[in-house]
């Protein structure tokens, strides 16, 4: 059984003079939505990609790095615990240790998963936090994602909303306008970058489906 990783003395930035950025992911949606962003960030910044291990099955994780032509993460935290409390605690603890030992200039997260709670440690260490998909609300406080997104929105230094509607939610929370930007969704770039592979896919044959004759539910 894997144990959470707390020692990151083997993880180093390249120290190439570029901004040192840690991107934290942990689930399939984050990997997909951030694919184009990760590629662009690696072009302009000194990047460490850290995976919390929230989704650790190959079909929910590894296959997407392969299909989206992304390099494997530099860090696997293996933060999944025996229950929700242990997992959330491990994510915060592992991330805090990673930030202390690598000293990034910024931390980027997307969305509202438990992996986004990694930024709590960044806030305590006064590391700037960049939050994509900020301002989303479902108004159901029983959902754990609603709690996560409210926490991350409030403590982030830069909130990147997908829409003007989401930006207004951030304003209603009291966040100043200089901390919020409407950037749109990065999924358009992900689809554009992978359009040839999507059109050439044999998934219909493999799943015995006929185009236009099925409904996809997720």
Where are these regions (language model features)?
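N-terminal subdomain of nucleotide-sugar transferases
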Residues: 2-54
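A nucleotide-sugar donor-handling region in carbohydrate enzymes
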Residues: 2-9, 54-59, 78, 155-218
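Glycine-rich helix-loop-beta junction characteristic of Rossmann-like nucleotide cofactor-binding loops
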Residues: 13, 99-101, 207-208
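Gly-rich Lys/Arg/Thr-decorated short loops/hinges at beta-loop-alpha junctions or inter-strand turns
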Residues: 17, 72-75, 218
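Phosphate-coordination loops involved in phosphoryl transfer and adenosine-cofactor binding
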Residues: 18, 104, 211-212
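Active-site and donor-binding regions of nucleotide-sugar-utilizing enzymes
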Residues: 22-25, 30-37, 64, 76-176
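Structural beta-sheet core signal
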Residues: 23, 49-51, 109, 131, ...
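Conserved nucleotide-sugar phosphate-binding/catalytic loop shared by glycosyltransferases and other
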Residues: 46-87
């Amino acid at each position: 059984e894997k144990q959470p990783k707390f020692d990151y003395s083997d993880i180093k930035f390249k120290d190439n003079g570029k901004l040192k950025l840690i991107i934290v992911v942990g689930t399939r949606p984050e990997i997909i939505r951030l694919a184009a962003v990760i590629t662009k960030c690696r072009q302009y910044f000194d990047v460490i990609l850290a995976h919390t291990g929230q989704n650790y099955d190959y079909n929910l994780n590894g296959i997407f790095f392969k299909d989206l032509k992304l390099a494997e993460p530099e860090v696997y935290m293996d933060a999944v615990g025996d229950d929700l409390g242990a997992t959330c605690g491990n994510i915060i603890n592992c991330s805090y240790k990673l930030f202390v030992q690598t000293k990034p200039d910024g931390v980027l997260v997307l969305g509202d998963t438990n992996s986004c709670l990694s930024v709590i440690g960044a806030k305590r260490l006064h590391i700037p936090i960049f939050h994509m998909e900020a301002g989303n609300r479902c108004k159901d406080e029983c959902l754990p994602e609603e709690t996560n997104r409210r926490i991350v929105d409030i403590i982030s230094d830069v909130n990147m909303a997908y829409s003007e509607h989401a930006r207004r939610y951030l304003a209603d929370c009291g966040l100043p306008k200089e901390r919020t930007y409407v950037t749109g969704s990065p999924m358009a770039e992900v689809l554009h970058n992978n359009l040839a592979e999507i059109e050439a896919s044999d998934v219909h044959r493999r799943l015995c489906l006929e185009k236009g004759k099925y409904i996809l539910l997720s």
